[in-house]
Amino acid sequence: IQSTSMDQGBLSEDSMNSFIRTLIQAGIWKNKVPKQTARTKDGTQTAVKKTKAEPDVVANKDRLGFQPIVSVDAELLRQQRRFSSPRVLLSENTPLEPPPLYLTEEPMGLNRTSRRKRFAEGKSHRGEYSVCDSESRWVTDKSSAVDIRGHQVTVLGEIRMGPS
């Protein structure tokens, strides 16, 4: 992917809009691949020229739900590293599987309403919160629990209100 003068706009633009514009210019957005490649038996890639009948075949495949797999060049990710977003993290590294939250065998892991920061590699110190399921159900036979800070607390059987 080569950058054009349009990519080098002023730095006050939204970083994700700039990234999406770069993808659109490269033909990656909406599954448009600028150049088709084919693999030979020895694993090397060669460029394939389109024939006149090929656009009809591609259009029919798109109507049937076929979507080609598009790989994004690692150089594009390196160029976009300066952009930061609270929701999207562009990284060349694959995420940990499973996330560190599920590896801990603590009472905190059993509390499905708590949120814990995951460990983030590098210098960004970005806090990633795991998304937990919510469960609306009364529990009547519980005498102790773990609060959102991880402290053991006693569950009151009854609450007295008003003058005593």
UniProtKB/Swiss-Prot annotation:
GO biological process: cell surface receptor protein tyrosine kinase signaling pathway; modulation of chemical synaptic transmission; negative regulation of neuron apoptotic process; nerve development; nerve growth factor signaling pathway; neuron projection morphogenesis
Propeptide: 4-118
GO CC terms in record: axon; dendrite; extracellular space; synaptic vesicle
Pfam families hit by this protein: NGF, NTF3_N
InterPro entries assigned to the protein according to its UniProt record, in alphabetical order: Cystine-knot_cytokine, Nerve_growth_factor-like, Nerve_growth_factor-rel, Neurotrophin-3, NTF3_N
Domain of life: Eukaryota
Region listing for Disordered, in residue ranges: 89-126
Keyword Magnesium set for record: no
Main localisation: secreted
Cellular compartment(s): Secreted
GO molecular function: growth factor activity; nerve growth factor receptor binding
Residues of the signal peptide: 1-3
Claim: Hydrolase is one of the keywords in the record: no
Keywords: Cleavage on pair of basic residues, Glycoprotein, Growth factor, Secreted, Signal
Residues bearing attached sugar chains per UniProt: 111
Family: Belongs to the NGF-beta family.
Function noted in UniProt: Seems to promote the survival of visceral and proprioceptive sensory neurons.
Name of the featured protein: Neurotrophin-3
Organism from which the protein derives: Cylindrophis ruffus
